[in-house]
Amino acid sequence: MVSTIHCDSLWYGADIVTMRGGKYHLIPQGAMAVTDGKIVWIGPYNELPRLSASREVIYSSGLITPGLIDCHTHLVFGGDRSAEFEQRLNGVSYAEIAANGGGIVSTVRATRNASEQQLLEQALFRLKPLLAEGVTCIEIKSGYGLSLESEIKMLRVARQLGELLPVTVKTTCLAAHALPPEFSGRADDYIDFVCDTIIPQVAKEKLADAVDAFCEHLAFSLAQVERVFLAAQQAGLPVKLHAEQLSSLHGSTLAAKFNAMSADHLEYATESDVRAMADAGTVAVLLPGAYYLLRETQCPPIELFRQYNVPMALASDANPGTSPALSLRLMLNMACTLFRMTPEEALAGVTCHAAQALGLQETQGTLETGKLANWVHWPLSHPAELAYWLGGQLPASVVFQGDARP
């Protein structure tokens, strides 16, 4: 006698794009059974086992993809730098803007001056458009406080976002983002402060899931970043790195040495960097929004990532200076158009590979038995349309941990 499987809910009637192994692996007319917020069965509807579901949801058509994951953002910050955008378009250089108190220094000042509640309200305003596009998991960095009090304030706000809205929030301590004004000309002293004070306190309060740094001529050196990584290691936190965005310092090789979850930007990564990332299992997080806004001309080495089987993730890099992007779907099109990624690679970049960049590959990023029941139902007929359309085509519905998101 065939036993009956009991589940909380059964969902069927749409084609399911599972993204197993980074490929579409489409199930026509698929079905998913969910219990306790996890998928307990997935497959073609006509192969359903005997099920008893407390609730059934029938999709009349369309596509289901895994919930989208934005694995690199700077959503929490104070102030507004839209005026700088106009200035740059009128020929004012970034150096001139910075000399007049603008640039990242203005964001640091505004973030320090803002209350926790003000930062929370502003971040909610930025997060909601991403959720409307089907984002079910997001990473949020600190890095605009650059003091113990303000870095902790930013991370607390990021944690609150995950408590207030139906979305998984992973937080990253990016205190080694820029040099605060009070440490002008004393970068090593600031790195001492980050390593000896900020990272240990953030770890003690369990406010961060990872530690990041910015390795670049205008930020921090390889030696300074290595000290940050050692402090993170001592605190029991994994690392990731902004690397090779504007020049080749081989920061991604250093990141790989520390088994970083990801190295991000990577426009100037070399073959040796890519090989090191492949050996370490470090994900390449590509950020076409920043590439676009900065009018960069050097693309990340996509062919090398393919050759060495380095997983490529995509993210919005939502931030006030170089990527004021509140659309992860737009990044799919940009990655295909600017970086020549395929639509399938792009979708993998905001699902399974983005999950890997956050260390969440065991629970999110694909639609498989045992994974969280996070998915998006789209009024589309082919998954390539997600990268093809510029704007529009919002999800018909989003499911987060087995429940339809309001």
UniProtKB/Swiss-Prot annotation:
The protein's enzyme class: hydrolase
Major localisation: cytoplasm
Function: Catalyzes the hydrolytic cleavage of the carbon-nitrogen bond in imidazolone-5-propanoate to yield N-formimidoyl-L-glutamate. It is the third step in the universal histidine degradation pathway.
Reactions this protein catalyses: 4-imidazolone-5-propanoate + H2O = N-formimidoyl-L-glutamate
Domain of life of the native organism: Bacteria
Keyword check for Cell inner membrane: no
Cofactor note: Binds 1 zinc or iron ion per subunit.
UniProt cross-references to Gene3D superfamilies, sorted A to Z: Metal-dependent hydrolases, Urease, subunit C, domain 1
GO cellular component, one term: cytoplasm
Binding positions for Zn(2+) per the UniProt entry: 72, 74, 242, 317
Gene this protein is translated from: hutI
Record PANTHER family: IMIDAZOLONEPROPIONASE, IMIDAZOLONEPROPIONASE-RELATED
Binding site for Fe(3+): 72, 74, 242, 317
Any single biological process term in GO: L-histidine catabolic process to glutamate and formamide
Protein residues bound to N-formimidoyl-L-glutamate: 144, 319, 321
E.C. code: 3.5.2.7
Annotated localization: Cytoplasm
Binding site for 4-imidazolone-5-propanoate: 81, 144, 177, 245, 322
Disulfide bonds: none
Pathway given in the UniProt record: Amino-acid degradation; L-histidine degradation into L-glutamate; N-formimidoyl-L-glutamate from L-histidine: step 3/3
Swiss-Prot/TrEMBL keywords: Cytoplasm, Histidine metabolism, Hydrolase, Iron, Metal-binding, Zinc
Name this protein carries in UniProt: Imidazolonepropionase
